């Protein structure tokens, strides 16, 4: 899926945080300031999504795997749905330390989960006492909670997508240590230098997270199908970009439509 400027505007991807909370390293991604809020230059967002999509598709064609990470409440269900849709892996609960840097040990815990699932399917648990069954279920539920999205993973992922650099900094730190490529949404209060491909965007709005995560999941699917991503700018997109760049009054009017709702979501996070 090719993401357009119009789509990004509609989901509120252009809303940053309050200007007083910004990270100066994000300056190059900011278009303007309105009502004390930084507004993203969505040209950079589109460029980053396209770059990430091409890279993901290329690696998937080569047989590499990817993990989607989103442990904050707005992203949890999205990363699960999109990872499952494209047949990749995900973490949407707490990041377990060593997941990448001590991968062989983590694999043992995933293997244990698989064995417990097989035991249930074979009916082995029918022989358990009440206490044994209770302990079995407790262990299985815990493993499923933290490792259910990693079932079947056999090697360290080449690409790690993170929905929030601050919330999931541990995932980023481990990914960099094992030389995985990190793609992440970066809001105006984030440090873009901690990831390989920063995607400047509102990282609190559910619809923005969904749109961008879906685009990356589509890239996985295209890579599996052996397709080369070719991006052509449509006439509609060119008009939207021209509007965004040249007519600030129209932008401001558009922004007002979803401004209050988007700011409420950000204030909850802050």
Question: PLM features: residue spans?
Answer:
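Intrinsically disordered, compositionally biased charged tails
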Residues: 1-6, 222-270
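Ribosome large-subunit tunnel/peptidyl-transferase-proximal elements
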Residues: 1-185, 191-201, 206-209, 213-228, ...
């Amino acid at each position: 899926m090719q993401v357009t400027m119009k789509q990004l505007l509609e989901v509120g991807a252009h809303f940053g945080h309050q200007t007083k909370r910004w990270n100066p390293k994000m300056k190059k991604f900011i278009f303007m300031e309105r009502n004390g809020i930084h507004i993203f230059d969505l040209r950079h967002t589109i460029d980053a999504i396209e770059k990430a999509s091409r890279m993901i598709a290329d690696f998937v064609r080569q047989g590499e795997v990817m993990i989607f990470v989103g442990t904050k409440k707005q992203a949890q269900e999205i990363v699960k749905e999109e990872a499952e849709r494209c047949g990749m892996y995900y973490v949407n609960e707490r990041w377990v330390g060593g997941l990448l840097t001590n991968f062989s040990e983590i694999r043992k815990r995933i293997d244990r989960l698989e064995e417990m699932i097989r035991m249930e399917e074979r009916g082995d648990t029918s022989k358990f006492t009440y206490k044994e069954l209770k302990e079995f279920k407790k262990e299985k539920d815990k493993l499923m909670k933290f490792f259910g999205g990693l079932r079947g993973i056999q090697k360290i992922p080449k690409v790690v997508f993170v929905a929030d650099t601050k919330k999931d900094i541990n995932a980023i730190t481990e990914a960099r240590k094992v030389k995985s490529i990190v793609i992440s949404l970066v809001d105006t209060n984030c440090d873009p230098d901690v990831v390989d491909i920063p995607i400047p965007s509102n990282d609190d709005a559910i619809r923005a997270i969904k749109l961008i995560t879906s685009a990356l999941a589509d890239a996985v699917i295209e890579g599996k199908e052996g397709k080369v991503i070719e991006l052509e700018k449509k006439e509609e997109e060119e008009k939207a970009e021209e509007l965004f760049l040249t007519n600030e009054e129209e932008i401001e009017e558009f922004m007002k439509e979803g401004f209050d709702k988007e700011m409420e979501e950000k204030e909850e996070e802050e």
